[in-house]
Amino acid sequence: AVYLNLCTFFESGHFPDHTSNIYDMFSSAMIAPLSDAQQEFLTVMGLADEFTVEMALFITGNQEAGQILSLMTRQNAFITPLPDGVSFRFHHMMKECTQRAFAMLSHEKQADFRNRYGQWYESQGQFLQALSAYNKALNYDAALAVIQKDAGILLASLSPEKVLAFLDACPTEILKNRPLALLVLMRRMFTWHQIPKMLELKQLLTDTIAEDNTLSEDERKNLSGECDLIMSFLMYNDITGMSVLHRQASSKMTRPAISIRKTGSWTFGSPSVLMMFHRRSGTLDAELTAMNECMPHYYRITQGHGQGAELLMNAEAAFMQGNFSDAQILLEQTYSTIASNGQHNISLCCDFLAARLSLFQEGVTFVKNPEVKRKELLSLHNMMWMNIFDSTYAYYYALIRMPEKIPALFKDHMLSTVSFLSPCRPMMEMIENQVFLSQKMYAKVIGRSETLLPVCEKMHYELVSLHVQIQTAAAYAMLGKHHDARQLLQKALGHAMPDGFLIPFVENYTYIKDVLSSINSITP
């Protein structure tokens, strides 16, 4: 600010008064004296948060971009080299001024540069940045191509409102020209609980399959089969019902699904497979059998997406029943099955089980110091993986009563700031309940559970509901309301015993032991 004031004084003979615009002062002092080529360089590259010389060459189309950047970095403290030795960043004041200058360019020039940004980010696999650039350039076809490439993986981190706004703006004919992108969007609409929009997109896809004469018969069948695969999610957590459509899809398809990537999320962000698919009390054995029979059909058309899920579900079931050695063997089999096949989601779910199992069984592989793994996950740029990782350590540290070590997302109760996919939110809320218990915020647990239990019932989340009932009973017990605690525990026992579930009671035993001992019978 002092420098800008002095510049104004030397130019005009007086210091600026309180009505002066700081951005105008900055532009006059730092940008206006530069050559046209330098000004254009700043104007265009000001859209980037960070950039390299290679990126600047591509975006500006100026072969002297490297020399310009080198000169300006030496002469201008408002362009900063970053510690990696190859990237640069504008000072926020410079960035604001150059973005204002960019807004003064013609619409054609703006669109041209934004398309270049889109092409650059797309080539680097930075699909969200590419999508944003193409969207601002109104290049809907290129944006849909990016959505298809991403297969909904990074798209999941956007708010539903942003994607719905994009769909409202995108012409129908352009949507119909990208049937594979429609499939990706259908699946994402399901995870955001936007079912009417999902069905609307399905109709567009059906029309395309019927009307597009350029499609071969094989591709029509592949698209129809992949549509069956996506529509199976409407029967989510009914394993047998989903598998009917998986087998139907498998009979039509001659290629793997394109709208579901092998490396993408399988659990929608849930840290547990069993919590997703245990639907009714007393049906555990049938659910495990169905999962074992159904998953091979799904793997065939998705190149092994979610591979190991059925093994992990069996491991979790054994753990829940207190069969720790069986659980450990199945867990190690799952780790071995998914080794080096890119199934980060299932691996993180294995870690969730390992964390809990390590409290009961010796020799369980569980990383007590999570910082190295956190850095590895951050390099993948996938917030869903980070959220599963945080949920594991939140639950673990809540169980061992070390709330100070719980990751900030859960410790500071910031779940409302995260755009979780709807199938995983009840699990995250249940884990936050356990955190509240460890923080002795018992009334909070009771108040939240009144809202969470009906959601679990509606989604057929029997196991999540069981956890929440026990947590609520624990909170009542800690507040001295033993009658309320006893009623909830008796109800929970009635739900748990047909499947032999013990561990949710054991994990909360410190809170409920006095009330539990007062219950005469634990048979349902």
Predicted regions and their residues:
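Amphipathic alpha-helical "lid/sensor" segments that cap RecA-like P-loop NTPase cores
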Residues: 1-21, 36-40, 46-50, 61-62
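C-terminal leucine-rich, beta-strand-based interaction scaffolds used for sensing/assembly
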Residues: 28, 32, 48, 53-96, ...
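Residue register of alpha-helical TPR repeats
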Residues: 44, 112, 180, 219-222, ...
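Amphipathic alpha-helical segments of tetratricopeptide repeats
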Residues: 74, 131, 151-152, 167-172, ...
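Extended alpha-helical scaffolding segments used for macromolecular assembly and cargo binding
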Residues: 100-181, 185-188, 197, 201-204
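Helix-turn-helix repeat elements of alpha-solenoid scaffolds
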Residues: 108-111, 124, 152-165, 193-211, ...
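C-terminal non-catalytic interaction modules
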Residues: 427, 434, 443-447, 451-524
